Amino acid sequence: MSRIGKLPIAVPAGVDVTIDGRTVSVKGPKGSLTHTVVAPIDIAKGEDGVLNVTRPNDERQSKALHGLSRTLVANMITGVTQGYVKKLEISGVGYRVLAKGSNLEFSLGYSHPILVEAPEGITFKVENPTHFSVEGIDKQKVGEVAANIRKLRKPDPYKAKGVKYEGEVIRRKVGKAGK
């Protein structure tokens, strides 16, 4: 048994889980998410509002998908109850972010400002011109949007300028030695 896959998934009050064949739908106070479980894995509702994820055999692929499927469904439940937040910060002279409606406008040292539109289910919050956050109920989408924003200007290893995750440590490099 997979260490992660064998753990039951607790369904909190206020969350409605519907299993229709291979499709799992989760509705909660923050919204709803749907996921299709891969073929060999089965999900069943147990007593006491618990979901159990099982696999039919001990083949390598079944073992790999067991823990993954359980974690994806658990992340859906966490998303519709608490949501996910990815905080980012900008460092560098003249680098800043502005909220333009539901979108973000970045000044990152290029000759033009960069406009990032919020995908469906994602919201941006700007705390100050150098700190902002990406919020949503889908963990994968929140992480992907945050990574795409970070990619606009990756942190420079020499001066540590750019967009980075809050708390991310940038390994600094020593510059060229002068004569």
UniProtKB/Swiss-Prot annotation:
One GO cellular component this record assigns the protein to is: cytosolic large ribosomal subunit
- Entry's Gene Ontology molecular function annotations: rRNA binding; structural constituent of ribosome
Keywords (alphabetical) are: Ribonucleoprotein, Ribosomal protein, RNA-binding, rRNA-binding
Q: Which domain of life is it from?
A: Bacteria
Q: Which GO terms describe its biological process?
A: cytoplasmic translation
Q: Which PROSITE patterns match?
A: RIBOSOMAL_L6_1 (PS00525)
**Function statement:** This protein binds to the 23S rRNA, and is important in its secondary structure. It is located near the subunit interface in the base of the L7/L12 stalk, and near the tRNA binding site of the peptidyltransferase center.
Q: NCBIfam families of this UniProt entry?
A: L6_bact
Instruction: Cite the HAMAP family for this sequence.
Output: Ribosomal_uL6_B
The protein's assembly and partners? Part of the 50S ribosomal subunit.
| Family in the record | Belongs to the universal ribosomal protein uL6 family.
State what protein this is by name.
Large ribosomal subunit protein uL6
Q: Whose protein is this, by species?
A: Streptomyces coelicolor (strain ATCC BAA-471 / A3(2) / M145)
The encoding gene: rplF
